[in-house]
Structures are given as C-alpha cells and as structure tokens.
C-alpha cells in the first residue's frame, strides 16, 4: 500500500492529453502492464489500480478505480484457496465469481503470451447463487511470459482484472448511469415541460360575423322585396370579414386599403367598383345640371328619401378618422 500511496502523489503531477481514453488490447495489457508488474511489484500504472477482489464487491469497484467510465482495471493477486493447491478463492462477503466459457489465448505475433478468463458474479453461495450482470475478464501470463520463466518471487501470480457491468441488451453500463439510477424518479417533473399547444394568436377560433352593406335600389326593387349586396362578388366574400368591419367608408382609408391589398384580383374588383362609382357620380352631376336648365325636379319620393336619410345618419354617426379628408359623398353610390 505504501507504493500505491506514493504513486498517488506522483499521479497528481501527471497530465493526460485531451481526449485520452484507456482502451488497451488484450496483448497490450499482458505485454506492457502485467508482465512489468510481475517483474517488479513496485510498478504502477496511471489507469490501473490495485485491489483485493476477495474483500470488495463488484459494485464497489468503480469508485475504487483510478479511471474509467464503462470498464475498470485493477492489479490483484490471486488468492489460493488452499496453501498447497492451485485453486483460486473467488468468494466475497456477498457472493462469488464463477468462471464461464473457455479461456482465450492471447498472442503477440505468433507467440503465446497470456490467457483471458471470463467470470460472472453471483449473489449468495454456490450452488444456489443468483446471477448478476457484473462481468470480469481476468488476464494472466502464459507461454513465453509464464511464471516458469520468472523468478521464484513472482509465484504470487499477479493478474489484471477488467470489470464492467452489462445491461439487458449486452452493452456496458457507464458509471454515470449507475450514479443516476437512484435519482431518476425524483428529477423528472412533467409540470416543467413546455405546453404542446400552440398559443399563436392566429389560431383563435373566434370568428367575426360578416358585415353586409346593402345598396339602396329604386322603388320597384323595394316592392319586389329584393335586397342587393354590393359586395356579392365571390372574390370579395372570400376576404376575412374582420378586415372590412374595421374600415370606415372614407375616401382616404378606402384608397389606403386598396393599395395595401396584395391580391391582383381584389385590386381589379376595387378598380372596377371605383370606376362605376365615379361614372355614376358624373352622370348624376350631368343630370342635375340638365334639371336646373329644364326645371325638371330631381326630388326623390318619400320612401327613397327616408331610406337615404336613415343610411346617411348611420354613416354620419361614424367617427371621422385623423385624416383631414372628409367622408365620400355616398349619394351616387346609393342611387346606383
């Protein structure tokens, strides 16, 4: 342990390059780390810690490692079950490690340098232990680097253990997920999520009733009970009603509306309507001038006059806009 503590002081002065990940191959673990540890027990590595697997449970190992997110590396000495035997003691207080499958040979070039054993941790005691998702790969020297070619002091048999936890899908679980497991139920608050409904003012379901502006016809049409609609054009009816009910019938504003409307068809409709009103106004002026010369009366009958006064009061009651231009003379428009 003195060596390990001394290494910790040296470790604080070492810097790793950006993006560094400790991801050695099986052959690199044997050649560059385990072989050096067996030759010199004081050897230490930046990314590999030292631990006694018989005194540590697998879920404690991630916090005992020097580094690693999904897998953790340790130097450890295999504990013999019997002093004179070769069987290894793999039991802990909570369970035991059980070997599974066949040992894998590790080569450097064409030379055998080590073996890899796969073990799974079981809770409880054999043979009724409960299998867990904790897995360990144990690396030992073999062949060219076997203990037979090493000094007798290396008989303690150092090994390197790689420990990780598998998920249900067979993937390794990172340590960050292990830390978050207990807090997932409390961190999530559905009330903090933004509303999925669109609060756009354009989605307002309120619709304005269409406004109809009646045309005042002659007495014959009134007797027939026919009511004409000046804006009976399909193009004009397709426009939102709330555009028109906000527009007073003043000359300045009507010109501004016609200029702001973007539809070419709508612009044509307004041009035709404006031309008809202007033509009617000219004919009315011509008729009035003729009547003054000939003495022909231009007075309207009582019914039309009453309708005219009623309509005029309705439009005169509107509030004048800020423009200095007065309201349009609607008399020719009503007579059309």
From Swiss-Prot:
The record's principal subcellular location, in a coarse class, is nucleus
The chain positions of domain NAC read: 16-166
Q: Where is this region: Disordered?
A: 313-336
Q: Name one GO cellular component term.
A: nucleus
Q: Where, if anywhere, are coiled coils annotated?
A: none
Q: Which PANTHER family match?
A: NAC DOMAIN-CONTAINING PROTEIN 100, PROTEIN CUP-SHAPED COTYLEDON 2-RELATED
Full protein name: NAC domain-containing protein 100
